[in-house]
From Swiss-Prot:
It comes from the Bacteria. The keyword Thylakoid does not apply. The keyword Nucleotide-binding applies. ATP binds at residues 77-84. One of its GO terms (biological process) is DNA repair. Can catalyze the hydrolysis of ATP in the presence of single-stranded DNA, the ATP-dependent uptake of single-stranded DNA by duplex DNA, and the ATP-dependent hybridization of homologous single-stranded DNAs. It interacts with LexA causing its activation and leading to its autocatalytic cleavage. It holds the Pfam family RecA. InterPro entries: AAA+_ATPase, DNA_recomb/repair_RecA, DNA_recomb/repair_RecA_CS, P-loop_NTPase, RecA-like_C, RecA-like_N, RecA_ATP-bd, RecA_C_sf. This is Protein RecA. Belongs to the RecA family.
């Protein structure tokens, strides 16, 4: 009796594998080769290509060395917090690797002089200033489907005004129109973004919800669809000023990885954004270097490999700016210890310390 039942189980497993093979071949005949496969059989599917954000500490906090290609990214925060700066720095990094980038300027507020200062190559940057939200998203869809664009930035979701609102009267109430537009666009975009390996960055603004008694009253514009479709969400805030004597020369900025489908979320980093320069790379090297024990700090003096960098943080930054070889050595050492730095030294903001709706948004 036992032998009969054993044979029956074996027959079932053979039947299952045959049925699976038949189903797979039928799917491939109907939808083309590669429409279904075993995930481990193609190494290119498993490994995710990334583009640096221009901030070493943020690259480490993201867990994969930058922002993932073929995914949707959302960067949100208050006014003048550095959202567009971070997006432009990502474009500059992609262009350094030979990538083609596009900027959909729905706010009609891009400053080309500032973009050039951040390292953006304006000659090869594609720019569009659409009149309506539908036009902006149609342009985005066409560029993504072309398969030729590596990074596309939409600035911003709040400025994607539906055509019905523009053609209507001032004061007309059109509830949920923008949210429906975003939901439909993301449904269409998500598959072509993945296939074309194009990273689409949505910059978003924040609004206040009325009557919230518990939790954060902040929310982002454009409904909830973007929160679900985004693989990475970054909350960027200005937390202070960088001063030289009495003059303010930059912002102290905190970025929290609110959602991350590629690595553990809720990592939090702080860095300086200098006016007319962007993210202070040398400042990050000094701060992260000290935390990781690569740069030694004795009193006010900073040193690396027994070589003095300077007295005080600003002097150490100046030394690294003037000596790029030393700066590159420190950066290489930090990138080699990225996992250790992320686990030990980057603050974990926790799920509650972000935007109101987002407690459970870890991939």
């Amino acid at each position: 009796m036992a032998q009969n039942s054993l044979r029956l189980v074996e027959d079932k497993s053979v039947d299952k594998s045959k049925a699976l093979e038949a189903a797979l071949s039928q799917i491939e005949r109907s939808f083309g080769k590669g429409s279904i496969m075993k995930l481990g059989s193609n190494e290119n599917v498993v490994e995710v290509e990334t583009v640096s954000t221009g901030s070493l500490s943020l690259d480490i906090a993201l867990g994969i060395g930058g922002l993932p290609k073929g995914r949707i990214i959302e960067i949100y925060g208050p006014e003048s917090s550095g959202k567009t700066t971070l997006a432009l720095q990502t474009i500059a990094e992609a262009q350094k690797k030979g990538g083609i980038c596009a900027f959909v300027d729905a706010e009609h507020a891009l400053d080309p002089v500032y973009a050039r200062k951040l390292g953006v190559d304006l000659q090869s940057l594609l720019i569009s200033q659409p009149d309506t939200g539908e036009q902006a998203l149609e342009i985005t869809d066409t560029l993504v489907r072309s398969g030729a664009v590596d990074v596309l930035v939409i600035d911003s979701v709040a400025a994607l005004t539906p055509r019905a609102e523009i053609e209507g009267e001032m004061g007309d109430s059109l509830p949920g129109l923008q949210a429906r537009l975003m939901s439909q666009a993301l449904r269409k975009l998500t598959a072509s973004i993945s296939k074309s390996k194009c990273m689409v960055i949505f910059i978003n603004q924040i609004r206040m919800k009325i009557g919230v008694m518990f939790g954060s009253p902040e929310t982002t514009t454009g409904g909830n669809a973007l929160k679900f479709y985004a693989s990475v969400r970054l909350d960027i805030r200005r937390i202070g000023a960088v001063k030289e004597r009495e003059e303010v020369v930059g912002n102290q900025t905190r970025v929290k990885v609110v959602k991350n489908k590629m690595a553990p979320p809720f990592k939090q980093v702080e860095f300086d954004i200098m006016y007319g320069e962007g993210v202070s790379k040398t400042g990050e090297l000094v701060d992260l270097g000290v935390k990781a024990g690569i740069v030694e700090k004795s009193g006010a003096w900073f040193s690396y490999n027994s070589q003095r960098l300077g007295q005080g943080r600003e002097n150490a930054k100046t030394f690294l700016r003037d000596n790029p070889d030393t700066a590159n050595e420190i950066e290489l050492a930090l990138r080699q210890n990225a996992g250790l730095i992320a686990d030990r030294f980057l603050q974990n903001g926790g799920p509650d310390a972000g935007e109101g709706d987002d407690g459970s948004d870890e991939g």
